[in-house]
Design a protein with these regions (language model features):
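Transmembrane beta-strands of outer-membrane beta-barrel proteins
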Residues: 1, 96-102, 139-143, 186-188, ...
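Face-selective signature of the C-terminal outer-membrane beta-barrel domain
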Residues: 1-157, 245, 304-309, 324
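Residue-level signature of outer-membrane beta-barrel architecture
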Residues: 88-90, 121, 127-132, 137, ...
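Outer-membrane beta-barrel signature, preferentially recognizing the C-terminal barrel domain
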Residues: 162-165, 169-171, 175, 179, ...
Length: 490
């Protein structure tokens, strides 16, 4: 279809929806989508290609016109978690210490949506050695070996040792902490990481108010390492005392697990990634769903720095001010973004899903800057406090939600987004997000009094300035709220 014909066609679709549902809100569309996700489409949708109407079209339309009345009953998930840990610790007079142990965890999950039972076992053996030298240097080193299985997949992780594969994955960590002077500390650490996908990430199928979670049987374990260098300094000036801390960090992942929103075929739970997939979904007659699926990002690098300070200013024996301030700078980079962009530039199918909303180098759903401040003034039995949180804009989101790339005409997915997410007073999800994806700050206040030794009251105002902000598409921050809390100690 040409862009003009496509525009005329979709304008007709939206006009028809407005005529059928003249007073529909975004919540109504969510009810409708949820109903279609649960009940599917009319049977034999493939017959429409031959001009034949499905035999159950009339009752299906009745459900569409009143999705709340025809909602399916709630399906309950059940989860059982059994955890056992044994730890042995031994100290010597010379400052050495060894900690070793075994951990076992068994998880059994029943999905009400698929009526399937999945089980996992995680066994780990670990050992850590700690030693202090010259009353200034602390050394720590450890190793942990893990075995993991889900259902009948008994070798979720393999390690090659002398040419043979064993079903255990070892990870190592080490750290140093050196006291340079009184209240001055230098530290460094290095640690490997390895995490198997959970039952939730691999097998979960759930529908929550029109948004689903879909399984990915092919998701792989994520692995990587983290390194940190930090300096901590104590300070005291008159009645003011506290600590300041500066740290730089670097983390690298391979096959990092992230979630991706998209459209799915409810017949086989696969992601709809082409017009052919959409036609097959119509033929299957089980309907579509919008939701998230966990998948692997080939390589990611996250580095940055953190600056923080906490302490106390004492006015007199009855009054003091406690504070905690922190700033974090992060560079969350997708190391393979150039290769992915080159591949996505070859896409020709109008329904083919891209990784994220832009061609940038950053991972999804992460800001670059964040700042947090907590202040508490205490006077006898009364305390007054405030929290200030500031975050910079989100760097990228999922492609199904919006496309930030420049284009001369809307494409097919832009119209699909309009149908999926609706609009309110001319405001679409994309336009609202572009307007509100900015730096934002929120302020919370609290006032408390300790009535007796056992009873305390606290009055809180969250989002004092009633700031309207959005920390991701379809998630608007709560408006100003008032909370009264009573604590009783027995």
């Amino acid at each position: 279809l040409g862009s003009d014909k496509l525009s005329d066609l979709m304008d007709g679709v939206f006009g028809s929806l407005d005529n059928i549902f003249p007073n529909a809100t975004t919540a109504d569309y969510c009810d409708l989508i949820s109903w279609v996700m649960s009940n599917g489409l009319p049977s034999d949708m493939g017959g429409l290609l031959e001009g034949k109407l499905p035999s159950d079209l009339v009752p299906w339309l009745s459900g569409v016109l009143n999705p709340k009345r025809n909602q399916s009953p709630t399906r309950t998930d059940k989860n059982y978690d059994y955890y056992l840990d044994y730890q042995f610790n031994k100290k010597w007079d010379g400052g050495a210490q060894i900690t070793t142990g075994l951990t076992y965890e068994h998880i059994r999950t029943f999905s009400g949506e698929t009526e399937e039972v999945h089980q996992s076992d995680n066994v780990a053996a670990y050992m850590q050695y700690d030693q202090r030298f010259w009353d200034r240097l602390s050394v720590s080193a450890g190793v942990r070996a893990e075995y993991y299985r889900i259902d009948k997949h008994y070798r979720e992780a393999d390690t090659k040792v002398f040419g043979s594969k064993i079903p255990f994955r070892p990870v190592f960590r080490a750290g140093l902490n050196y006291q340079l002077a009184d209240y001055s500390f230098l530290r460094t650490s290095f640690g490997q990481g390895y995490r198997n996908p959970s039952i939730t990430e691999k097998y979960l199928r759930k529908d929550i108010g029109g948004v689903g979670v879909y399984p990915n049987y092919n998701v792989q374990p994520e692995k990587g390492f983290n390194a940190e260098l930090g300096f901590k300094q104590g300070y005291k000036a008159g009645n003011l005392q506290g600590f300041a801390d500066v740290a730089a960090f670097y983390t690298q992942y391979k096959d990092m697990v992230e979630f991706q929103f998209g459209l799915f075929n409810n017949a086989d739970l696969s992601m709809i990634n082409s017009v052919t997939d959409a036609i097959q979904m119509l033929k299957n007659g089980k309907g579509f769903g919008i939701g998230a699926q966990f998948h692997n990002v080939s390589k990611a690098q996250i580095y940055g720095m953190e600056i923080s300070t906490n302490g106390m200013y004492t006015f007199n024996k009855n009054a003091k001010l406690l504070y905690n301030l922190g700033y974090v700078y992060t560079e969350p980079r997708d190391a393979d973004y150039k290769k992915r962009n080159a591949l996505e530039n070859t896409y020709t199918d109008p329904l083919q899903m891209k990784e994220k909303s832009n061609d940038g180098k950053y991972l999804k759903y992460r800001p670059k800057h964040s700042f947090k401040a907590t202040l508490d003034f205490q006077w006898k039995r009364i305390n007054i406090g405030a929290n200030v949180n500031w975050k910079s804009k989100m760097l990228a989101v999922d492609y199904i939600m919006l496309d930030e790339r420049s284009k001369s005409e809307p494409d097919l997915l832009d119209y699909v987004r309009g149908i999926l997410f609706g609009s309110s007073n001319g405001e679409t999800l994309a336009s609202y997000w572009k307007k509100h994806n900015t730096d934002y700050a929120t302020v919370d206040m609290r006032f408390g009094v300790k009535a007796t030794k056992e009873v305390a009251f606290q009055f809180m105002i969250n989002n004092l300035l009633n700031k309207e902000y959005s920390y991701r598409p379809m998630a608007v921050g709560a408006p100003r709220t008032f909370v009264v809390k009573m604590d009783v100690t027995f």
